């Protein structure tokens, strides 16, 4: 239950596991579990039984959560995975900054 370093709609790159080097958008963050769900990463096959909402049933594909330690923020300017630092601007707002190039997120 550590603090998650990425937020919803951030672009991230997977740094380990079967989907290593895939780039995707964070769909949701699960802070109590320390996991994130990334678009088109860790896609699992689920056999859905027919029920009232889904009368057809069948096989569906959906993204499963992965640990947040396996993803890094992706900087569009650097075109690579990067660490971030927090910076306070003159007007008092706190922004996230790329450690490599200084670009704000």
Curated annotation (Swiss-Prot):
Q: Which Pfam families match?
A: KOW (PF00467), ribosomal_L24 (PF17136)
GO-annotated biological processes: translation
**Keyword line:** Ribonucleoprotein, Ribosomal protein, RNA-binding, rRNA-binding
Biological role stated in the UniProt entry: One of two assembly initiator proteins, it binds directly to the 5'-end of the 23S rRNA, where it nucleates assembly of the 50S subunit. One of the proteins that surrounds the polypeptide exit tunnel on the outside of the subunit.
Self-association or partners: how does it assemble?
A: Part of the 50S ribosomal subunit.
Entry-linked HAMAP family: Ribosomal_uL24_B (MF_01326_B)
Entries under NCBIfam families matching the protein: rplX_bact (TIGR01079)
Q: What is this protein called?
A: Large ribosomal subunit protein uL24
**UniProt organism field:** Clostridium botulinum (strain ATCC 19397 / Type A)
